[in-house]
């Protein structure tokens, strides 16, 4: 038996895959920031959860960033699957070897192709602009932040990607966004 909402979400993925993934990413980016803001505030017995202040503009910025991120990752997972299928044709290995090779190649491609492109051309520029950094300073921001970001990304995402690259392609954005939270 499917979880409540799973069938509807699967139908939306089938009918409007990019829109569904983009809106999902936006929602979960916003939710992640909401959780972060709640965890940043001091907790005391006298402070009820409903009395905590939330920076709605910040949540909105995260959600806007998530819209584009959903599109980027939707496109990436399709490209990565195409490259993986071309480089490791189905049936060329036993089923376990096929799964292992596909997962490893997906992770390598993501770390060395997608992440440098995504961080340099989307995430860092968008976050920088949202933070008020002038457009002319963005190349310096990328040069300054990209190397450490790629190293930290590999540390966090390599284990998660072992699972993500074994999820059906339609569901990978949701799986990835869930790890983001």
Describe each PLM feature range.
Residues 1-11, 44-49:
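Transit-peptide-like, low-complexity N-terminal presequences
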Residues 5, 95-96, 103-104:
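Short linear motifs at secondary-structure transitions and domain/linker junctions
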Residues 10-15, 51-56, 92-99, 139:
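Helix-boundary and loop/linker segments of multi-pass membrane transporters
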Residues 15-42, 55-88, 99-131, 145-181:
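Alpha-helical transmembrane segments of eukaryotic organelle membrane transporters
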Residues 43-44, 138:
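Short, intrinsically disordered/low-complexity patches at protein termini
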Residues 46-47, 86-94:
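Transmembrane helix-loop-helix
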